[in-house]
């Protein structure tokens, strides 16, 4: 079997070269495309927490690949177990990380654990690519000709191993000739929409216009939004969804304006052990992300020094506000969710 140390693997934002894991620095985009080495647990955790590598699926994949590489380098099972624990705690909200690490932990328990971990990590990458494609196919079928769609945060190849979740839907709809344009929320405070989604859509040739988050309501009121598409960091057993802060606001606005609100995510984002949105841990981030802005363009501080800040990275959208959960298995309706689709017994 080919080992990771001899394999050249690359996605939009991850690559393995000469047995080393590299990540595309998503804090530097779109001004600079820089690849950073992530060859230790400490360095990867730092990159994850600094959002240089981000997106629920991609975080899980980067952790899995690094563990497999460390196993091939001779790290003991005991140290790999410690690495699993440390990586699991690096970001609390995205459940894909926990799900991927659970599979890597099972591989670690196998008699041939080194080869088992390499095989499992590669399997996770291949699966994610396939899951993205299925989500895109199911979602694109919901897009009517001439649609103006609105999206939030970043859900494309930068956040996955494939074409993305919500952005994958937009791509396939565009290729099928049904997409007029995309409204891109800038996504405060870290501007993932303005920096990353705008860059990705431009690279894909998809027409878009960038808006401030607060402009979405006006667009909806004037009939300029036909549907909203977002991703997810965790789906609870009752269908509640945790996603980038600002998602809940869009869902409330969509409900008021009677606009479809779709969540596109792989089944690996579902957490059957989490009963509802109230049980989802919400990461709190640094005040500096709100009092100023940083990135490939440098840093600008605009708020007074020592300003008190509340900065949750995610919010929870209640299932009652969601028109459909577009998974790799198909489009799940509110009626199916109410009947217990996401409950543990399923």
Curated annotation (Swiss-Prot):
Pathway, according to UniProt? Answer: Amino-acid biosynthesis; L-methionine biosynthesis via salvage pathway; L-methionine from S-methyl-5-thio-alpha-D-ribose 1-phosphate: step 1/6
Q: Does the keyword Nucleotide-binding apply?
A: no
Query: What reactions does this protein catalyze?
Result: 5-(methylsulfanyl)-alpha-D-ribose 1-phosphate = 5-(methylsulfanyl)-D-ribulose 1-phosphate
Q: Where are the transmembrane segments?
A: none
Annotated family = Belongs to the eIF-2B alpha/beta/delta subunits family. MtnA subfamily.
The protein's enzyme class: isomerase
Q: Which residues form the active site?
A: 233 (proton donor)
Purpose? Catalyzes the interconversion of methylthioribose-1-phosphate (MTR-1-P) into methylthioribulose-1-phosphate (MTRu-1-P).
Q: Mention one GO molecular function.
A: S-methyl-5-thioribose-1-phosphate isomerase activity
Q: Per UniProt, what is the name of the gene that codes for the protein in this document?
A: mtnA
Keywords, A to Z? Amino-acid biosynthesis, Isomerase, Methionine biosynthesis
Q: Which GO terms describe its biological process?
A: L-methionine salvage from methylthioadenosine
Look up the EC number in the record and give it: 5.3.1.23
Protein name as it appears in the record: Methylthioribose-1-phosphate isomerase
Q: Which SUPFAM superfamilies match?
A: NagB/RpiA/CoA transferase-like
Superkingdom is Bacteria
Q: Which residues does this entry assign to the site Transition state stabilizer?
A: 153
Indicate which residues the UniProt annotation says bind substrate. 54-56, 91, 192, 243-244
